[in-house]
Swiss-Prot record:
Top EC group: transferase
HAMAP family per record: MenG_UbiE_methyltr
Gene of this entry: menG
UniProt protein name: Demethylmenaquinone methyltransferase
Function, in words: Methyltransferase required for the conversion of demethylmenaquinol (DMKH2) to menaquinol (MKH2).
Keywords, comma-separated and alphabetical: Menaquinone biosynthesis, Methyltransferase, S-adenosyl-L-methionine, Transferase
Reaction(s) the record says it catalyses: a 2-demethylmenaquinol + S-adenosyl-L-methionine = a menaquinol + S-adenosyl-L-homocysteine + H(+)
Organism from which the protein derives: Phocaeicola vulgatus (strain ATCC 8482 / DSM 1447 / JCM 5826 / CCUG 4940 / NBRC 14291 / NCTC 11154)
Binding-site list for S-adenosyl-L-methionine: 70, 90, 118-119
């Protein structure tokens, strides 16, 4: 099935979305962390913590962090969960290069590694991981259904899937305030700090188009997962999705 966000691309209508997303993140990689924390007022750190805390009772030893970017989630997860290995995958080498430096600085390079992977065609064998995490990345998938099915394939039986994704508040006045923030503040700050206005115009557009709440949980179930649930965080600005294979 095609979803609205799959048609939204950072730069033009001609090139494949995955190619443009890779180019976009390579472009903004140097400024990404600063801008990401600024735009979320550092609340993104607490969102990651909630996702990681849900995984803690299951003691996953082999974790894949999809769309790992600069490794923020991977580092935080490794420090809390202490897995044997954590593999961060992404299509952007620019983002992962920043992540590799951060992992080395944190002294975690013996446990965290990075691999360039297309989430819709993973190179890992079936039932490879105890847990898979995706923080702020699923709306960039070129094919959401295919990406979810691939994650299901490489998860062990009873393995856990955790997805964090930005979302739109749906109640007054937060919905109206968020609309102004996303249409004016995000693109303006994005242009100032990253020099790539298109990337931060694409961000709110892709959030608006992405399936949320019950619709997203139905999509996750269709990929083969069960025990699917979601929690809205910070007045609905972010949503946490939880599932089991």
């Amino acid at each position: 099935m095609n979803y609205p966000q799959e048609k939204i691309k950072p730069y033009n209508a001609d090139e494949k979305k995955s190619v443009q997303v890779e180019k976009m993140f390579d472009n903004i990689a140097p400024a990404y962390d600063q801008l990401n924390h600024a735009l979320s007022w550092n609340i993104d750190k607490s969102w990651r913590r909630k996702a990681i805390n849900w995984l803690e009772p299951f003691h996953p030893q082999h974790i894949m962090d999809v769309a790992t970017g600069t490794g923020d989630f991977a580092i935080q997860a490794c420090q809390t969960l202490h897995p044997q290995e954590l593999i961060g995958t992404d299509i952007s080498e620019g983002m992962m290069n920043v992540g590799r430096e951060k992992v080395k600085a944190a002294g975690l390079d013996s446990r965290i590694s990075f691999a360039k992977e297309d989430c819709t065609a993973l190179t890992f064998p079936d039932k490879r991981f105890d847990a898979i995490t995706v923080a702020f990345g699923v709306r960039n998938f070129e094919d959401l259904d295919k990406g979810l099915r691939e994650m299901h394939r490489v998860l062990k039986d009873n393995g856990k899937l955790v997805i964090l994704e930005l979302s739109e508040p749906d109640w007054f006045p937060m919905k109206q305030l968020y609309a102004v923030y996303s249409k004016i503040v995000i693109p303006t700050l994005g242009k100032l700090l990253s020099k790539d206005r298109s990337a931060y115009t694409y961000l709110p557009q892709s959030i608006k188009a992405f399936p949320q709440g019950e619709i997203m949980t139905d999509i996750i179930r269709k990929a083969g997962f069960n025990q699917v649930s979601f929690k809205r965080l910070t007045l609905g600005i972010c949503t946490l999705y939880l599932a089991t294979k």
